């Protein structure tokens, strides 16, 4: 499955940029309280609505960091399942669809184990010094599970848009997500890793 990922935070950054949908601009939300840096380009899949009312998050494995606002056509290869203080907070893992260097990456088990551990460790600790923030990491899921999650989030986005909910996310607000959100999509984990926690 190919998707468009809008990058908010380039690889190697501590600044946490977010798309301000109302203003149509990139806003600096905060600098990470810890000394960690994003291990890959980070953004979201367009026209999706996750359980937390935001677009579905995505990581893009890429050799050179891009820039906030860059749109990348990506191939989905897996997903990291996790939760934060607001609930489900899954991260879809992607690679640029037309990069021959990434041609061998087709599913989560194609990503080296140590690289997956680096990504997992980042999400276990990146909010550790922020008051009131909680993270619980769960496991890696395969490409099929990631694609099922994307389809569920696209359906949720379409349903919320049909309800005529205006707002910041392409006509969909976080409040609309509460009405449109359903149960967590299923999906078998592949190459699962141990759970961790941060607060």
Annotate each predicted stretch with a short phrase.
Residues 1-187, 191-192, 196-199:
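Hydrophobic N-terminal alpha-helices or hydrophobic patches in metabolic proteins across all domains
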């Amino acid at each position: 499955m190919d998707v468009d990922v809008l990058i908010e935070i380039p690889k190697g950054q501590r600044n946490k940029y977010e798309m301000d949908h109302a203003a149509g601009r990139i806003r600096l939300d905060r600098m990470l309280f810890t000394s960690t840096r994003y291990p890959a380009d980070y953004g979201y899949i367009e026209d999706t609505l996750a359980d937390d009312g935001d677009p579905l998050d995505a990581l893009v494995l890429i050799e050179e960091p891009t820039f906030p606002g860059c749109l990348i056509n990506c191939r989905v290869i897996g997903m990291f399942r996790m939760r934060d203080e607001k609930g489900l907070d899954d991260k879809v893992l992607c690679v640029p669809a037309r990069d021959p260097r990434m041609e061998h990456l087709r599913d989560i088990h194609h990503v080296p184990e140590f690289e997956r551990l680096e990504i997992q460790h980042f999400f276990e600790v990146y909010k550790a010094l922020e008051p009131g923030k909680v993270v619980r990491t769960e496991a890696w899921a395969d490409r099929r599970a990631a694609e099922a999650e994307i389809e569920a989030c696209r359906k949720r986005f379409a349903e919320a848009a049909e309800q005529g909910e205006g707002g910041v996310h392409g006509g969909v607000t976080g409040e609309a997500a509460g009405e449109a959100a359903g149960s967590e999509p299923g999906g078998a984990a592949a190459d699962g890793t141990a759970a961790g926690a941060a607060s």
